[in-house]
Swiss-Prot record:
InterPro entries, per the entry: Adenylosuccin_syn_GTP-bd, Adenylosuccin_syn_Lys_AS, Adenylosuccinate_synth_dom1, Adenylosuccinate_synth_dom2, Adenylosuccinate_synth_dom3, Adenylosuccinate_synthetase, P-loop_NTPase
Any one Gene Ontology molecular-function term assigned to this protein's record: GTP binding
Subcellular location: Cytoplasm
Gene3D superfamilies per record: Adenylosuccinate Synthetase, subunit A, domain 1, Adenylosuccinate Synthetase, subunit A, domain 2, Adenylosuccinate Synthetase, subunit A, domain 3
Keyword DNA damage tagged: no
Protein name: Adenylosuccinate synthetase
Binding, GTP: 12-18, 40-42, 304, 330-332, 412-414
Cofactor binding, per record: Binds 1 Mg(2+) ion per subunit.
Bridged cysteine pairs (disulfide): none
Family the UniProt entry places it in: Belongs to the adenylosuccinate synthetase family.
Enzyme class at the top of the EC tree: ligase
UniProt binding sites for substrate: 298-304
Annotated binding of Mg(2+), by residue: 13, 40
Length: 429
């Protein structure tokens, strides 16, 4: 069987965890191909809410093998804290595997992340402060430490010492912080070796063998399209490629083996941290969406910025990722709103743009051009088909589908996995 990739189509927090959980019972592997413990997602199973950060949502699917892929950066302390938290609630985490080639987040990465954000002041990106960016910087600079290095103390020490030569210069001379002792970092990593060893595999080989055997592999992208370091609203982005192409790189599964590219998109739009957001609301309606939608970060608790659905973003995300399907989430949050605006194009200095402006400056100047749709007051959380939806809710969904350029195959009408309208099967249709 070919592989399936799930990608956020906005700025994150679209409900990728729900989509993965919904499909998890029908797949054999769930892979996290990028990111670290900076991108939290919430999964609701049987009324129980689970907030996951580093672990793939597939950890809650009893028949799927969850894998942290080679494109991830792993904070070992956070990993085992998350595992322990799930096990304390009765979850089985014994199937979890970690790629030997995944990079590690060191304590000094977290220090650098926080002091750099403070140093930037008003120009700060708004990172989570968890060291993800600095870990990816080391990976690209060939200074990174990988999971496999924890099992070879000589290599580990050599890499830590090499990395700290540069970082201590920066910490002491620029940020006026004390230097970091290499021995302490080596001991920190070695303390996890015994517990880590049984989890580590050659994930590329494992996944490709599974596909050869006819098994189904689901790749669960972290963050989202417009946080992609290449395709996002640079520089207000993450440090990896959370697009469909990045999922291929971060898992070791070749692009020709991917049959479905599924975009996860909210029925409105949210964003955390700094950066442009054309449809952002600064009034009571923004607060209403925030409170009704529970729009607070899983990792940081920060309130998410809220705005209306942006079809320009949806079309661009579909193009960049080659989406075959959209899974729309949180339609129920819009219940009770009299009129719902949808951004169909931008006005940039008097010129209409139906597609994403080419430059960062133009996007910062983009003013949304709205079309308006009548809302609905009926409770839709029990809807399981399009026909179950009130007429205005159905019209809204069909309009978004047409504007977004990709078929809507599933629609979330509540937080639980079964509160979903499935229009087209996401694996076989």
């Amino acid at each position: 069987m070919p592989a399936i990739v799930i990608v956020g189509a906005q700025w994150g927090d679209e409900g990728k965890g729900k989509a993965t959980d919904l499909l998890g019972g029908r797949v054999d592997y769930v892979v996290k191909p990028n990111g670290g413990n900076n991108a939290g997602h919430t999964v609701v199973v049987g009324g129980e809410k689970y907030e996951l950060k580093l672990l793939p949502a597939g950890i809650l699917s009893p028949n799927a093998i969850p894998i942290i892929g080679n494109g991830c950066v792993v904070n070992l302390e956070a990993l085992f804290q998350e595992i322990d938290g799930l096990e304390a609630r009765g979850a089985d985490t014994s199937r979890l595997r970690v790629s030997a080639n995944a990079h590690l987040v060191a304590p000094y990465h977290q220090v650098l992340d926080k002091v750099t954000e403070r140093f930037l002041g008003s120009r700060a990106i708004g990172t989570t402060g968890r060291g993800i960016g600095p870990a990816y910087m080391d990976k690209v600079a060939r200074l990174g430490i990988r999971v496999q290095d924890v099992f070879d103390e000589s290599i580990l020490r050599q890499k830590v010492e090499g990395s700290l030569r540069q970082k201590n210069e920066l910490l002491v001379k620029v940020y006026n912080r004390r230097d970091i002792i290499a021995d302490e970092i080596v001991e920190y990593f070695l303390s996890f070796a015994e517990r880590l060893r049984p989890l580590v595999i050659d994930s590329t080989l494992e996944l490709n063998n599974a596909l050869d055997e006819g098994k189904v592999v689901l790749m669960e992208g972290g963050q989202a399209t417009f946080l992609d370091v290449d395709h996002g609203t640079y520089p207000f982005v993450t440090s990896s490629n959370p697009t469909a192409g990045g999922a291929s790189v971060g898992s070791g599964i070749g692009p020709t083996r991917i049959s479905r590219s599924i975009g996860i998109i909210k029925a409105y739009t949210t964003r955390v941290g700094a950066g442009p957001f054309p449809t952002e609301l600064f009034d009571e309606m923004g607060v209403y969406l925030q409170k009704t939608g529970g729009e607070f970060g899983v990792n940081t608790g920060r309130p998410r910025r809220c705005g209306w659905y942006d079809a320009v973003l949806a079309r661009h995300a579909s193009r960049v990722n080659g989406f075959t399907d959209y899974f729309v989430t949180k339609l129920d949050v819009l219940t009770g709103i009299e009129q719902i605006p949808v951004c169909v194009a931008y006005d940039v200095d008097g010129v209409r743009h139906d597609e994403m402006p080419m430059t960062q400056t133009e996007f910062h100047h983009a003013v949304p051009i709205f079309e308006y749709f009548d809302g609905w007051t009926e409770d839709i959380t029990g809807a399981r088909t399009l026909e179950d939806l009130p007429e205005n809710a159905r019209n809204y969904v069909l309009a978004l589908e047409k504007l977004s350029g990709t078929r809507f195959s599933a629609i979330g009408v509540g937080p639980d996995r079964d509160q979903t309208i499935v229009v087209h099967d996401l694996i076989n249709d």
